[in-house]
């Protein structure tokens, strides 16, 4: 069984292929005993900070004869793919001096290590705190003893389905039949297109509608109008919310195949097939969604999927009766087996076709979007009411909701949020009075820290990456110089809520295109971009999704309602050991045992294990038995995921792990995204393109 894998671009396939062919010649080797245990990480800032804290705690409490632990950062952007590439390079080089002892990564890394006999078993570590079902993925990793433990699920995440309450309220209110007593709310802005949709009267649907109404009322109560709204009728409050949502979504249209004569039930969110059908009907009912190319601030889709691969894999596993023999690939006799994929008569292949076509209907109506790696996540679009609902990893909870007033940049079809007003800063244009012809701009960061932008050469009293950036791109240089003599003032078209055609420095992972978004290197350890011709908007509370306005449900547990077993995806990086030498292996396990089992007092006076401390700080789920039964301290995403993990009737799905399964996942992801961007791609084209992408590495297994 396997947790979530890495995303690799085609540019990485060369080194991967090299490793595939060469690793058979790389045998087990000992690292130099340097007297310390190195933990390599590519985690987020919040997780890195908590790891630094627990390592400091361990080093201060350990026995003087025990080895200290040191944190090694491989990629500050959180790219587990880059972490894996670094590990592969060190294996190929037999790097005895710069390798590490532990890493957080996905479990196919164990399979990679095992091909060089460099895996480290945790059989002697006390893992009794874990719920045993969360350790069972170890017996579904290729090339290792299925009865041993090599990967510890210390940072688990699940998937949830998040409904944008105000948006969905507007959609349903617009489409509903006026005579339907279940919904008494006025349709949005007295829409003249009277709906004919019927709302079911079962208890589950009634309960959901109550939550949607509450979300719409809450959305209407902005800080500026709260007093007014508190004196208004409930129907006027929800209508105020609907009016705001209509600005983005436009008018509802009664069309065949849309919500016309449709019966809405809450159970539509329980399986992928019905959910895709519902989303398709919504897409047909709003003409703004029919536009293929959308600007960054416009409605984007009905349904956003955080991970297309996870959606397809869980739907496929559910439709195959929760049997890995009916999955796209599996592990047999400690080797990966792709026979189901290449056999068009197999249950897995036929199910794959049905599932693809279910999503294809939604794609054809411009109703589906997905995350593009290191680009705008679906959570960000939902935050600004540009989606009706989306699936998300529980780990993205901290990034999913807006504060009362949010600023963001609109750049063509991309958006960049100014998180906590600490990630986007306007570039101030230099003038002739600055007495430096190479100075082409300045930026004031938080705490009034000044950063200077130079062409050609930086002043001798400045340090690149600290208080200066050297701009090398000629397009960007020419843009900044052309603005140099202009007065920095608002144009007549600007309002207090908008800055148009401005230049900004942003700390963001959005991909540079060297046209409007330029990569300018690292600034104080963070990736910096300069964005030109951007519009900065300030979004009030009523035009954004607040945490209390979201309705968090379990991600669909079946492909269709008749599937016999409900499925819950388990994903996330594991703590993985790497062989070093006899002494360091012992010291590594000693630290891991402390990490999992020792109760420690932390700065907020809480007493918990280091593993619990890290998981709580980074919004991960730690599947300890005692924590699955107590969800009081969890956020709504994690609480929802835990509720299904704790359900004995739910089958946990974790992807089979092999050094090649990563390539399959990346191929599925890239080709599904291609189908979203190119509606001419049908199932046959999808399979042909995926087969070509996988190449001989997979075909010859």
From Swiss-Prot:
Membrane topology: Lipid-anchor
Signal peptide: 1-22
Record keywords, A-Z: Cell membrane, Lipoprotein, Membrane, Palmitate, Signal
Main localization, broad class: membrane
Record keyword Membrane present: yes
Localization annotation: Cell membrane
Lipid attachment site numbers (S-diacylglycerol cysteine): 23
Lipid attachment, kind N-palmitoyl cysteine: 23
Single GO cellular component term: plasma membrane
Keyword Translocase in record: no
Domain of life: Bacteria
Pfam hit, one: Lipoprotein_X
Family membership: Belongs to the MG185/MG260 family.
The protein, known as: Uncharacterized lipoprotein MG185
């Amino acid at each position: 069984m396997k947790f979530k894998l890495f995303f690799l671009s085609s540019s990485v396939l060369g080194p991967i292929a090299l490793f595939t062919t060469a690793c058979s010649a790389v045998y087990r080797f000992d690292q130099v005993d340097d007297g310390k245990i190195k933990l390599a990480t590519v985690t987020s800032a919040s997780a890195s900070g908590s790891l630094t804290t627990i390592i400091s705690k361990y080093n201060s409490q350990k026995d003087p004869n025990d080895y200290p632990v040191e944190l090694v950062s491989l990629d500050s952007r959180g790219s587990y793919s880059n972490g894996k590439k670094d590990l592969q390079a060190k294996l190929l080089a037999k790097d005895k001096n710069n390798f590490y002892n532990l890493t957080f990564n996905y479990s196919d890394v164990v399979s990679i290590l095992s091909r060089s006999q460099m895996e480290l078993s945790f059989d002697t570590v006390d893992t009794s705190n874990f719920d045993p079902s969360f350790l069972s993925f170890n017996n579904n990793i290729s090339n290792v003893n299925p009865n041993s433990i090599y990967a510890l699920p210390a940072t688990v995440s699940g998937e949830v389905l998040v409904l944008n309450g105000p948006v969905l309220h507007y959609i349903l209110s617009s489409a509903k039949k006026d005579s339907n007593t279940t919904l008494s709310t006025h349709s949005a802005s007295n829409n003249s297109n009277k709906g004919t949709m019927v709302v079911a009267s079962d208890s589950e649907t009634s309960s959901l509608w109550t939550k949607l109404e509450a979300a719409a009322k809450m959305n209407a109560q902005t800080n500026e109008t709260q007093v007014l709204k508190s004196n208004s009728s409930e129907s006027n409050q929800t209508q105020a919310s609907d009016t705001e949502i209509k600005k983005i979504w436009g008018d509802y249209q009664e069309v065949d195949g849309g919500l016309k004569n449709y019966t809405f039930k809450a159970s539509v969110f329980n399986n992928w097939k019905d959910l895709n059908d519902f989303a398709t009907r919504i897409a047909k009912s709003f003409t703004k969604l029919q536009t293929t190319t959308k600007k960054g601030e416009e409605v984007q889709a009905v349904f956003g999927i955080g991970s297309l691969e996870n959606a397809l894999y869980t739907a496929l596993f559910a439709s195959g009766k929760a049997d890995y023999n009916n999955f796209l690939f599996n592990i047999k006799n400690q080797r990966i087996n792709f026979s189901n994929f290449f056999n068009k008569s197999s249950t897995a292949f036929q199910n794959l076709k049905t599932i693809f076509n279910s999503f294809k209907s939604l794609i054809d109506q411009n109703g589906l979007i997905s995350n593009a790696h290191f680009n705008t996540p679906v959570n960000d679009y939902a935050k600004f009411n540009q989606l009706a609902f989306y699936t998300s990893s529980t780990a993205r909870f901290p990034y999913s909701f807006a504060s009362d007033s949010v600023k963001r940049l609109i750049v063509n079809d991309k958006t960049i949020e100014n998180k906590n007003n600490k990630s986007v800063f306007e570039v101030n244009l230099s003038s002739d009075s600055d007495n430096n012809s190479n100075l082409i701009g300045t930026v004031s960061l938080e705490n009034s820290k000044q950063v200077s932008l130079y062409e050609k050469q930086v002043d001798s009293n400045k340090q690149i990456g600290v208080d200066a950036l050297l701009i090398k791109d000629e397009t960007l240089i020419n843009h900044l110089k052309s603005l140099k003599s202009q007065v920095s003032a608002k144009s007549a078209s600007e309002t207090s809520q908008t800055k148009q055609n401005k230049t900004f420095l942003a700390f963001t992972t959005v991909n540079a295109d060297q046209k409007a978004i330029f990569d300018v290197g690292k600034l104080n350890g963070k990736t910096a971009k300069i964005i030109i011709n951007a519009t900065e908007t300030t979004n009030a509370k009523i035009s954004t999704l607040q945490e209390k306005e979201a309705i968090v449900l379990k991600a669909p547990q079946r492909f269709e309602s008749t599937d016999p077993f409900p499925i819950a995806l388990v994903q996330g990086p594991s703590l993985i050991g790497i062989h070093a030498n006899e002494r360091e292996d012992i010291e590594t396990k000693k630290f891991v045992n402390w990490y999992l089992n020792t109760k420690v007092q932390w700065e907020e006076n809480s007493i918990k294990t280091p593993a619990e401390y890290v998981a709580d700080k980074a919004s991960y789920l730690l599947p300890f038995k005692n924590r699955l039964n107590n969800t009081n301290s969890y956020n709504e995403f994690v609480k929802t995921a835990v509720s299904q993990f704790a359900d004995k009737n739910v089958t946990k799905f974790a992807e089979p792990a092999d050094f090649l399964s990563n390539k399959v996942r990346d191929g599925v992801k890239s080709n599904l995204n291609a189908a979203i961007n190119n509606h001419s791609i049908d199932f046959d084209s999808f399979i042909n393109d995926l087969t070509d992408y996988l190449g001989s590495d997979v075909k010859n297994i």
